[in-house]
């Protein structure tokens, strides 16, 4: 009985995990696809190049390593076994796309730091193509480390096709430091500097003071507020969310890379899908929370929705309008001498009826 109950609990946990993983997959595809369309249709966004790159990386991950995590046999969530060549391909994709995502997030944070802190120094900002070329070069090198790891086990044994379960061999600590520790430090430095600049601007006193009247409202405005206002609170929201999301999604995966392979393999499915949830969180964190992106999305949505036909409003003809029209007809040279009096008489007959209606 206990064995059956334990089996049912395990099956229930597996089913719930599979449903949550499917929701993460669907959210990553829909969110990044929508944000990519908005960015491509609105090229005047300041960080459009980095946003589009992040969406492309997330969509690549949602089309490659996330379905493998859903369908592949344990340590994945499915039951489809992978042959050695597919196992090596899965290792390479995981080892390359995860650093491309984390380094892309760090590049986006640094770009926003330069736009906010140094807005009038465009020469201090490197070209986005150069930055993203460096990101993909580093991701390709980190992906190549997976090819230097131990070969996959033969088919009778369970194939370990991930970075956590021995896929990198002795290179796992180096991969974790470059894929997670370095982007985390860059992101923390960028958003920390943004927060300090915003807080310093909030603490700065106003340049000029306006003359106040001697009214009661003016005197009451000198009173301190009942609740102390936290200076820089709104400016701290975006950095806190960005750093918090990065730490919540990627810190468990990075710590598992530094743990022994046996302990990392035990928590591989949970830690992997917590990291994959970042692909679904990026469109909301770096898209919908940004006011220019929200405005562009609303504008495109209004254009896409069908517009209701405008109702035809009946125009009421008043007496002054009829008289003005009568004068225009008298002055119109196109009308002949016989046509103008006839139309004048017809308009004159309509005038009493309109005046009675008014």
UniProtKB/Swiss-Prot annotation:
Alphabetical UniProt keywords: Cell membrane, Endosome, G-protein coupled receptor, Glycoprotein, Membrane, Receptor, Transducer, Transmembrane, Transmembrane helix
Transmembrane stretches, start-end: 18-38, 54-74, 90-110, 129-149, 177-197, 235-255, 269-289
Tissue-specific expression: Expressed in the brain and testes. Expressed widely, in the brain, including the cerebral cortex, cerebellum, hippocampus,thalamus and pituitary gland. In the testes, expressed specifically in the germ cells.
Chief place where the protein resides: membrane
Lipid bilayer topology: Multi-pass membrane protein
GO biological process: adenylate cyclase-activating G protein-coupled receptor signaling pathway; ligand-independent adenylate cyclase-activating G protein-coupled receptor signaling pathway; positive regulation of calcium-mediated signaling
Documented effect of changing residue 111 to D: No effect on constitutive activity; No effect on protein level; Does not affect homooligomerization
Region (Disordered): 334-358
Glycosylation sites (chain numbering): 3
Residues in compartment: Extracellular: 1-17, 75-89, 150-176, 256-268
One cellular-component annotation, GO: endosome membrane
Residue ranges, Cytoplasmic side: 39-53, 111-128, 198-234, 290-358
GO MF term set: arrestin family protein binding; G protein-coupled receptor activity; identical protein binding
Record note on disruption phenotype: Deficient mice show any abnormality in growth and behavior. Both male and female are fertile.
Domain of life: Eukaryota
Protein localization: Cell membrane; Endosome membrane
Pfam families, per the entry: 7tm_1
InterPro entries from the UniProt entry: GPCR_Rhodpsn, GPCR_Rhodpsn_7TM
Protein task: Orphan G-protein coupled receptor. Constitutively activates the G(q/11)/inositol phosphate and the G(s)-alpha/cAMP signaling pathways. Has spontaneous activity for beta-arrestin recruitment. Shows a reciprocal regulatory interaction with the melatonin receptor MTNR1B most likely through receptor heteromerization.
Quaternary structure and interacting proteins, as annotated: Homodimer. Forms heterodimer with MTNR1B. Interacts with ARRB1 and ARRB2 in a spontaneous and agonist-independent manner; leading to the internalization of GPR62 in the endosomal compartment.
Family: Belongs to the G-protein coupled receptor 1 family.
Domain statement: Lacks the conserved DRY and BBXXB motifs. The restoration of these motifs affects its constitutive activity.
The protein's name in its UniProt record: G-protein coupled receptor 62
Organism, as annotated: Mus musculus (Mouse)
Lineage, uppermost ranks: Eukaryota, Metazoa, Chordata, Craniata, Vertebrata
Encoding gene per record: Gpr62
